[in-house]
Amino acid sequence: MDVNPTLLFLKVPAQNAISTTFPYTGDPPYSHGTGTGYTMDTVNRTHQYSEKGKWTTNTETGAPQLNPIDGPLPENHEPSGYAQTDCVLEAMAFLEESHPGIFENSCLETMEVVQQTRVDKLTQGRQTYDWTLNRNQPAATALANTIEVFRSNDLTANESGRLIDFLKDVMESMDKEEMEITTHFQRKRRIRDNMTKKMVTQRTIGKKKQRLNKKSYLIRALTLNTMTKDAERGKLKRRAIATPGMQIRGFVYFVETLARSICEKLEQSGLPVGGNEKKAKLANVVRKMMTNSQDTELSFTITGDNTKWNENQNPRMFLAMITYITRNQPDWFRNVLSIAPIMFSNKMARLGKGYMFESKSMKLRTQIPAEMLANIDLKYFNESTRKKIEKIRPLLIDGTASLSPGMMMGMFNMLSTVLGVSILNLGQKRYTKTTYWWDGLQSSDDFALIVNAPNHEGIQAGVDRFYRTCKLVGINMSKKKSYINRTGTFEFTSFFYRYGFVANFSMELPSFGVSGINESADMSIGVTVIKNNMINNDLGPATAQMALQLFIKDYRYTYRCHRGDTQIQTRRSFELKKLWEQTRSKAGLLVSDGGPNLYNIRNLHIPEVCLKWELMDEDYQGRLCNPLNPFVSHKEIESVNNAVVMPAHGPAKSMEYDAVATTHSWIPKRNRSILNTSQRGILEDEQMYQKCCNLFEKFFPSSSYRRPVGISSMVEAM
């Protein structure tokens, strides 16, 4: 049957069909090869936006640094990072005036967190720059290595202490004249295998001690490693993101805790809430502006876009903000919070793997590591790369580039949101002192601005004033990419608003399907995703029913568990057919055992085992859920588990689903190959730690420590 796609949309307002234009089906693009070029782009661009600043040299590391703060006021519309300190401080003061006590209360909340947080907070998170090995490692490993080195250098670090004590060690380590570290290297040798008599390459991991002088250590402590951001949809060019090392992470965490606490109290902030809560917050602001504008005023909304938000922000500005926010607090607290921005003002960007060269004629490939870029002959490079390298050379030290201005992606999302909201806050009539006024929403670098005024000239004047005010604090609203509309239709953080939020269902598409954890969890997650989308995203009953059928089909295909009476032959069909024939009540078999699907859109909230329990043969129940069955998972099963689902936008989010322990809740065994690598020792430590924890728990059931999420966790193993 031919379907004319335009007919589908005849009854649908254009805004509701917007989700069909999003690039969310199919695989997202991944980057291959080195991120060195993208990182050099970031460094060069950041310096270009601040080029009229003052150059200084860092006395400890010898790194050249550019400081654009209080630089010249912009004369054109080019993006620039010349924030004016007094303007930022004034914006902070007005923010506090409009929200009495907000900074004071947030400081008190943060102080409590600072005193209670334990070091293992830093084991959360994915890849982290491990300064001891000079490459990325899982967070738990990088932390363990750092603590080990600190210990061997007479610092008091321990894995279960308070984070604040670990940060004291970090501060002390920076004063040391030298630090001794253990590095790993691989030895390869060819030996004859006794059994097969073939030659094999044996790898051994060697360890050697290395001393870092103060300068080298500081450079490593201030280094952000860079990678290419993967899976970004709808973009032609890739871009670089940063992973900081353990020295910086703890300080950043406390600053973000403070900023998060402030954001929670600001009605214009799109962080840290999400989902329906965020939509409600936004709808309130819109309602406020529309109610006031009904008869006398015009109201327009800008769907805003900022040019290179991160690259024009400045850590020195964040330092000024923190100094102001914490001005009545005890010194120790002010010091702890001011270290993160100070470290960022002195940060170094690691250029990544370097470049790969290959000669077609001689079939040779060679890697040029980033360290060599400072003095290699440029004739080997193409023109664009040559320009990049020439530009970055004055900034290079040991394969890292000095990068004082700019923030790198995703480091101070909360704090930069506070800065954005402080400008939105200045739109109140008591501050504009004229007929126009504004309000809006800010979520990291994304914003929506609602301007009200008696006539079009007033709207224009309001937008201009907002634009110029932003320039004064280093925020550059893009005139090309922002657009203005009558209030009632706009987009903010991929939520489309048209007299209420329109469901952008395509964003959820990537999370449909089989997760690949195990048969039990996958079934549960699959139906929960469909249920959640019926609740939150306008997934209609007919579409949901179809999604469910497709999911079951996909699930059977993945686990090769087609119905017992099917003709499809797979490597499981022999066993499943036998089970089908032996079973009296066939409706009681789980789908993963070749049973029929009993789900429909009315019973998605019931776990499959519960749905079919009454229908099961007694001996099948016994095999499926008998705690003495060696295949039933013995760890205490919480009734609710968390799955990681991948929406199209933003980070992977956690989703709860019901977990019933059966023979299908298996946990795959770890891949053997880790046992031959340098990670092996870590693995053994971790198992030891786990055993001790389990013992401890048996004796003290009320103990309230957290199990570490180490590299042995499921997701890492996958």
Curated annotation (Swiss-Prot):
Which reaction(s) does its UniProt entry say it catalyses?
RNA(n) + a ribonucleoside 5'-triphosphate = RNA(n+1) + diphosphate
Q: Which UniProt keywords apply?
A: Eukaryotic host gene expression shutoff by virus, Eukaryotic host transcription shutoff by virus, Host cytoplasm, Host gene expression shutoff by virus, Host nucleus, Host-virus interaction, Inhibition of host RNA polymerase II by virus, Nucleotide-binding, Nucleotidyltransferase, Phosphoprotein, RNA-directed RNA polymerase, Transferase, Viral RNA replication, Viral transcription
| Polar residues: bias regions | 55-64
Modification after translation, per record? Phosphorylated by host PRKCA.
Domain RdRp catalytic, by residue range, is 286-483
Q: Name one GO biological process term.
A: symbiont-mediated suppression of host gene expression
Return the EC number.
2.7.7.48
Give the top-level enzyme category: transferase
GO molecular function per UniProt? nucleotide binding; RNA binding; RNA-directed RNA polymerase activity
Task: Report the superkingdom from the record.
Answer: Viruses
Q: Name one GO cellular component term.
A: host cell nucleus
Disordered as annotated region, ranges: 50-81
Q: Where is this region: Promoter-binding site?
A: 249-256
**Any single Pfam family the record assigns to this protein:** Flu_PB1
Q: Motif span (Nuclear localization signal)?
A: 187-195, 203-216
Per the similarity annotation, which family is this?
Belongs to the influenza viruses polymerase PB1 family.
Summarize subunit and interaction data from the UniProt record for this chain.
Influenza RNA polymerase is composed of three subunits: PB1, PB2 and PA. Interacts (via N-terminus) with PA (via C-terminus). Interacts (via C-terminus) with PB2 (via N-terminus); this interaction is essential for transcription initiation.
Q: What does this protein do?
A: RNA-dependent RNA polymerase which is responsible for replication and transcription of virus RNA segments. The transcription of viral mRNAs occurs by a unique mechanism called cap-snatching. 5' methylated caps of cellular mRNAs are cleaved after 10-13 nucleotides by PA. In turn, these short capped RNAs are used as primers by PB1 for transcription of viral mRNAs. During virus replication, PB1 initiates RNA synthesis and copy vRNA into complementary RNA (cRNA) which in turn serves as a template for the production of more vRNAs.
Q: What is this protein called?
A: RNA-directed RNA polymerase catalytic subunit
In its UniProt entry, the species of origin is given as Influenza A virus (strain A/Guinea fowl/Hong Kong/38/2002 H5N1 genotype X0)
